[in-house]
Amino acid sequence: MDTDDAEGAAAAAEYYVELSGYALAAVDDSDLKAMSHRTCGYCSETLEQVAWLASSGGSYAGGEMDASVDDPGKYVRDEQTGIYPLDVTVTQEALTVVDRDGVEIASEPTSVATARVEVGRSDGSWVIVEIASVPEG
């Protein structure tokens, strides 16, 4: 994340995705907020989930994420937007969400998917602009 190039953008994308799982489990969104662009839908949804867990007394178990960008050097920054569009392979461990009474309200099995993570710079720091499905074609 220390370099202002595709390698730095890839490191920021991997870190943010992995931090998302931690933020939910720890109910701590401080680092996630700092890297979330105000227009990022995925970011907003994740921050809302953390806030819900904190206010409702619910908990999130499992869900650890591992993120990987294969060959970051092949990605180029969009000159008009300044954004690096990166394809990130994400493995998420099985997870369970319970309410304050310990009643399971959601669960997901382990999954592997590829997501498009758009990474930009703001005031010299990396920010996540969006995380979405990889465009077809």
Predicted regions and their residues:
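Core segments of small alpha/beta cavity-forming domains
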Residues: 1-61
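Sparse, context-dependent recognition of short Cys/His-centered cofactor- or disulfide-binding micro-motifs
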Residues: 9, 17, 50, 69-75, ...
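N-terminal short leaders/motifs
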Residues: 23-26, 68-86
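Exposed beta-sheet edge and beta->alpha loop/turn motif
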Residues: 76-137
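Residue-level signal for well-ordered alpha-helical segments
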Residues: 1-2, 8-9, 27, 63-67, ...
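A short, amphipathic edge element
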Residues: 55-74
